[in-house]
Amino acid sequence: MLVEYAFLPGIDKQSSDAGAENRWIDSDNVRFRYGLPEKVGGWSSLVTSTMVGVARAMHAFTDLSGNRYVAIGTDKFLLIYFEGQLHDVTPLKATLTSATIATTNGSPTCTITKAAHGLAVGDIVQLDSVTLPGGTGFNNADFEDKNFQVISVPTTGTFTINQASNASGTVSTGGSLSLKPYEPVGPRAQTYGYGWGVASYGNGNWGEAAAASDVSLEPGLWSLDNFGEVLIATIANGKTFTWNGGAATPLTNRASTATSNFQTTNNPTASRITLVSPTTRHLIHLATETTIGTTTTQDDMFIRFSDQEGINTYAPTATNTAGTQRLQDGTKIMGALKAKETILIWTDNALYTMKFVGAPFTFGFEQVGTNCGLIGKNAAVEIDGIAYWMSPKGFFAFDGTVKSLPCTVEDHVFENIDTTKGQQITAGLNNLFTEVIWYYPSANSEYNDKYVVLNFGETALVKIPGGVWYTGTEARTSWVDATIYPKPFATKYDSTATGTFPAIVGESGLGQTTLFEHEVGTDQVNPNGTTTAVTSFIKSFDIDLESRQRGQREKLAGETFLALRRFVPDFKSLQGNAKVTLGVKRYPQDTQVTTALSPFTITSSTLKKDTRARGRFLNIKIENDTASESWRYGTLRLDVQPDGRR
């Protein structure tokens, strides 16, 4: 008897394998579209180079001539992607002159001496005006206009760098060079802090480490937005810089606080987040200084906004619209998004709206939710006035009121997430497929390695209790949806590899980020042009003989064995091959046995597959594991018969 089994879209991990009636229970690199599961599209590297460090933010914008830019903020650099190339526009600190250098024969380590250099381990510094002392074995060109990573800081007046080769002579100190330090951004990973500052003075014995800590050392983050054709870039808990995409030769310029006509020299010098108001063009600083220029006055709940159209004017007067506001519910502002004519502001406990109301207050603030705080700065997205976000307590949406979202994969996500790394979580919108994607670090991972998706379009279409959710293991650290470019862009970080741009001599342990264009082809195309298969799979719940009859009469719940004789494939589309595995069990918690002859290799011309299997429960797994394969599955058709009770 040929029987058809229909499945609801989405993954159900809240139920047991047998209890998730008519549901899929596991997947990777699979999405749902009009109720049917399909492999996701591939992704292709946009450039042949890889970025040094881990990207945490992207922002797409255009200049007035229509040139398209994507700003990318990493833990080391601020980069611009422009039509197939990356450009370094990272702001520099003040140049330090009259430094000297020392080398040791047979070692790549060079010691640079400069009083009060202010550099820390991991900082990037560019060397300029280099005149080496004799006897080092190096040439001036080995250092001139080259970037180096600070390897160690023995004293406040010395630091070390590594050359690409060993020195052939020992020179105690000499020569002359200038230092151009890059503005530091922050660590590449979020950690709990230990040591000085993690507890109150006098807590514990001298020299004794704290057993635990609730002090989180946040990763290097950026706020990226545009003021027309001008990029506004703020380092988290640091300064704000601008880069003018409309300048005569913009890609030769660096972001700066002194950009002509767009200075930020009067801006706060320590802000967690910045953005530009969508209709009034105020530059808003969140979790910023109560006294501009004094970083010790940074208040994690304090907001400061500029004069309208005046991104460098913050002193309120009777004739401007600059001002301030302090929020109350929470301990720190975590994130903010523009939603039509409203700005949404999350603390670690609450949600506020910020709306333009005119004189005398300029903006009005209203608390619209509590116990719904944001888990990390980049863990929220907005589409057409509706915001979706991840909280330490679950998933939420705001469409005028805050709603807690039921989630059929909730335990799978929140029981295996490293909540101490919330600032590494990034949310992305893939509007073409009505998907909100959260990439997050699992409990045993230093970096993002898993994802969870809410398909808000499918949820509205099918109206399934709990919504249409699915999960997987692909890792991304930042995302920008198709706006000025026709496809989404995303970044992937590899901590074990070495980035190639910007070039850093003697680089060690910074990792690399690849910039991908998504929904392209079927595979992963790497920066060197090689192809890696994007594997995918989906697995069903444990079907019993009467699964399809639920609601028609009292269900016998696996009382009767089923005998399987034939599988009839029904793929809506199939490129290359798909692999289908049928598994059977005698009991829900029994070990699965693969049916005879499976896994089956299915092509577009496969009409049926004969097999033999017997059990109370049966499931199907559809997957692909080689390149140039893609599939979309329809309905499950099996030839099954009742086969007794033992």
Task: Provide a role label for each language-model segment.
Residues 70-73, 232-234, 285, 344-345, ...:
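Conserved beta-strand element within WD40/beta-propeller blades
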Residues 240-259, 579-588:
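Short linear, low-complexity motifs centered on an aromatic residue
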Residues 1-94, 185-192, 201, 221-223, ...:
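Beta-sheet repeat architectures centered on beta-propellers
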Residues 66-69, 229, 341:
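Structural hallmark of WD40 beta-propellers
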Residues 229-243:
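Hydrophobic or amphipathic alpha-helical targeting/insertion segments
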Residues 42-62, 90-94, 204-217, 249-425:
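Beta-propeller and closely related beta-pinwheel folds
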Residues 1, 89-220, 249-253, 262-266:
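Small/polar beta-strand repeat architecture
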Residues 74, 84, 113-118, 161-170, ...:
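Secondary-structure transition/turn motif
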